[in-house]
Amino acid sequence: MSGTILENLSGRKLSILVTTLLLCQVLCFLLGGLYAPLPAGHVTVLGSLCREDHGRQNDTGFLLYSRGAGACIPVTREEVEQDSTKMANELVHVFQMPLPRDLRDLDYSRWQQNLIGVLQVEFGYDSSSELREPPRELQLTIDMRLAYRNKGDPDNGWKLYAHGVEHRYLDCVSSHVGPTETLYSCDMIPLFELGALHHSFYLLNLRFPLDTPSQMNLQFGHMHDLTLTAIHQNGGFTQIWLLLKTVLFPFVVGIMIWFWRRVHLLQRSPALLEYMLIYLGAALTFLNLPLEYLSLVFEMPYMLLLSDIRQGIFYAMLLTFWLVFAGEHMLIQDAPNKSTIRSRYWKHLSAVVVGCISLFVFDICERGVQLRNPFYSIWAMPLAAKMAMTFIVLAGVSAAIYFLFLCYMIWKVFRNIGDKRTSLPSMSQARRLHYESLIYRFKFLMLATIVCAALTVTGFIMGQRAEGQWDWNDNVAIQPTSAFLTGVYGMWNIYIFALLILYAPSHKQWPTMHHSDETTQSNENIVASAASEEIEFSHLPSDSNPSEISSLTSFTRKVAFD
């Protein structure tokens, strides 16, 4: 058996390969740290108060806007207070995005990919109100209308994008106590999420209808300031991200073809680890495919959901591979039968499968529904929000437990290798040098696996933390840095690229060394061969199972022949 490239590659060539890959890894971090802006940006828009014509409340095509020709005339708070009915069912809160800068109108770019809106509400009660405690889980009914227009359209050329009447629940605290009224400031609430930022300008109209028979919105005093925070992906970050994908995609495809061709040249069926490597490469290729370019031409509101699905498939495959990778090197395979996922790893992988399916269902329940109703949010209902938060926390805890279990498996691998190294002194010097070098290389690869797993789990937990709503009340811009995101993404590609190279079958054929020839080889020749930088590690005679791809996995069944 010729073994793998990891076993047979010369020290000089291996050093060049590792150095090149490490330089590429540093380049990925620098690309995000020096050239890419923050992954996301946000703008805060204070709502303008307008009064609509009587009887047009149910006309969804009637839209009010605050800038441009034909804009509505703003209504002041004093005018509302002086009105006998407080302008009930006539007030519209208008938000026009993006805001102008330096007297110049700005527009959204398709490079910004998506748009999320969250709202902060402030309202007041008269001092004569019977309210004694801050409102908790106070139901607010909102009539929401989202519209858009593009460059070149007239100022009044707004087109309705979505309309819905939704319920939100507010938790508020007292922010100001005055002689005539008490002001309350409420937690931010999710308002809408657009999976595609295809148009240049967006307009949001909010109405808070009052209805006595159904007690709709009657528990509120009167609205004060409404602040909309619009969060978008930064276009500069998207360009760097797509550049990274565009460069990495052909390299991974090419190395997969090369790897699978070498496997099929062998006179045996592919081993389990070889199958897992090609599946992992396929999942990475699907993730690398720069489909985001299509969103620059076509409106694809499902792009966020598709990105989550691609990321989920890759996570599932990567977590599965690490368990199999560590398990195949446990060096305790006493049975000669070929390993299969079902026979050896179903207990370990069942938890991974259940977790990934649960996350997929959770994602479908929110982003799948948002394809038809961008105002829908699983965080809108108190019970659903608590369940979602519990689910996210459990996902983060499960990721940490998985990492600890993987560390335990790799520790067992190291311990088993250490136990079997006691047999090295009884071997011939050539055989001992071969295995010592192989063990050193394998330990380095396992340590690289631990680092990759640690950064992956950290990124996953940070992503789940960003999904939660607990940060909105402090800082809506909390996010991983661009350097971390591009670095981890590059690390996945470099790590899998290296595995496909190092675990590809080596086709070098070495002359058979008989026992008598090996035992009579002089010590001087052995030392001279080991010291040479160009020497290839020869595969010594063994009785290994032909289905194995690494001589290290059969180390425990080797018997010293000295």
Swiss-Prot record:
GO terms for biological process: imaginal disc-derived wing margin morphogenesis; intracellular protein transport; positive regulation of protein secretion; positive regulation of Wnt signaling pathway; regulation of intracellular protein transport; segment polarity determination; Wnt protein secretion; Wnt signaling pathway. It is found in: Presynaptic cell membrane; Postsynaptic cell membrane; Cell membrane; Endoplasmic reticulum membrane. One of its GO terms (molecular function) is Wnt-protein binding. It is a multi-pass membrane protein. Glycans are attached at N58. Pfam families: WLS-like_TM, WLS_GOLD. One of its GO terms (cellular component) is endoplasmic reticulum membrane. Coiled coil: none annotated. InterPro entries: WLS-like_TM, WLS_GOLD, Wntless. Residues 541-556 have a biased composition (Polar residues). Residues 539-562 are annotated as: Disordered. Residues 35-239, 292-311, 366-390, 463-482 are lumenal. Keywords: Cell membrane, Cell projection, Developmental protein, Endoplasmic reticulum, Endosome, Glycoprotein, Golgi apparatus, Membrane, Postsynaptic cell membrane, Segmentation polarity protein, Synapse, Transmembrane, Transmembrane helix, Wnt signaling pathway. It comes from the Eukaryota. The keyword Endoplasmic reticulum applies. The keyword Nucleotide-binding does not apply. Interacts with wg; in the Golgi. Interacts with Vps35, a component of the retromer complex; wls stability is regulated by Vps35. A segment polarity gene required for wingless (wg)-dependent patterning processes, acting in both wg-sending cells and wg-target cells. In non-neuronal cells wls directs wg secretion. The wls traffic loop encompasses the Golgi, the cell surface, an endocytic compartment and a retrograde route leading back to the Golgi, and involves clathrin-mediated endocytosis and the retromer complex (a conserved protein complex consisting of Vps35 and Vps26). In neuronal cells (the larval motorneuron NMJ), the wg signal moves across the synapse via the release of wls-containing exosome-like vesicles. This is Protein wntless. The gene is wls.
